[in-house]
């Protein structure tokens, strides 16, 4: 099991909560929605410089499908692509593959892994997306991102669209 500390704030304050006092989701809550999903795919490096690609299911039925792993640069170019079959028993976790990190990422600060898991029990389809960075975010060799915004009013709602020509980690928009 897991404990989610702390879900929300009971007054306006800077805190570790996933939801602020006004009910707005913070970055943590978006991540929590992903890591508490019924099926997940993750990459975990080991001490021998391998990358364990694993999947986990909380679904009480057997699942089958595939896991696609893409090694991409920060401009979105796919450098390598792998597809692995996945067959899980009910509520099972399993390592799908163990890969050599040196063969995946010659320049760890210029690439990342993107995972796309699609499983079904014959009735329901489950999808999960995840990523793995071979180095800390602060060491990623990113180009300067130009972020453009469009703010439109449609009937009673405002719509904010952000676009970037290159990755821009952890962009936050605040409307007042």
Positions of PLM-derived features:
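Carbohydrate-binding surfaces of carbohydrate-active enzymes
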Residues: 1-176
């Amino acid at each position: 099991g897991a404990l989610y500390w702390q879900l929300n704030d009971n007054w306006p304050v800077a805190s570790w909560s996933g939801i602020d006092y006004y009910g707005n989701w913070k970055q943590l809550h978006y991540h929590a929605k992903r890591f508490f999903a019924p099926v997940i795919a993750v990459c975990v490096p080991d001490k021998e410089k391998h990358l364990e690609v694993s999947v986990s299911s909380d679904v009480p039925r057997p699942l089958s499908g595939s896991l696609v792993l893409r090694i991409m640069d920060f401009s979105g170019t796919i450098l390598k692509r792998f597809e692995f079959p996945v067959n899980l028993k009910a509520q099972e976790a399993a390592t799908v593959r163990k890969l050599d990190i040196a063969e995946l990422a010659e320049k760890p600060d210029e690439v990342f892994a993107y995972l796309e898991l699609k499983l079904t029990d014959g009735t329901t389809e489950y999808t999960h997306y995840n990523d793995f960075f071979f180095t800390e975010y602060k060491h990623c060799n990113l180009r300067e991102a130009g972020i453009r915004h469009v703010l439109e009013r449609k009937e009673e709602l405002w719509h904010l669209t952000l676009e970037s020509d290159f990755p821009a980690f952890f962009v936050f928009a605040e409307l007042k």
